[in-house]
Amino acid sequence: MIFYLYPVIVYIIMKIAIAGTGYVGLSLATLLAQNNEVVALDIIPEKVEMVNKFISPIQDEYIEKYLAEKELDLTATLDGESAYSNADFVVIAAPTNYDSQKNYFDTSAVEAVIELVLKVNPDAIMVIKSTIPVGYTESVRKKYNTPNIIFSPEFLRESKALYDNLYPSRIIVSTDPSDNRILDASHTFASLLKQGAVKEDRKSV
């Protein structure tokens, strides 16, 4: 973490790991890499190679434009341990496929990330961005005996994901008011999303 002190404003560069480079993950990686050090993780070598060449592996006009034209502190990797080991925040945007017949979300990919983060960097704040069932965040906090998991729902459209992050209708981040560290982390993450947005006056809750 690096602090730049000016007369009035303190700029903080955070180290952020993003697990997953689908619409949610890559749009967030692009948004946050404008002002922070971001490492994106994926299991597909071709996607990692493309991101490292600043070529979008998904169709999204704004992601393509920002990767090509903006100065972004963004790298991609296949190595989860290296991605998570020094991160202040780990954003989990892993797939959670929904089975409508069984009314079931497959959260195994999310929990695989949680387990690896707890192994290599247990103090990191994990922010779940994946689609998950009601009550899931609280259940994994109890299951893994850690307070360092929060949830921030996404309101994104495919092919418009970065645009919707740049012009958010609202920013929502869960917290634990009984834990000052988590309360501060939630406010910090909401501020990072606002900082990357074109319009920073959006209400966050």
Language-model features, listed with the residues they occupy:
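Short, Lys/Arg-enriched N-terminal segments with co-localized hydrophobic residues
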Residues: 1-13
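Structural/interface elements that position substrates and couple domains in central-metabolism enzymes
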Residues: 10-204
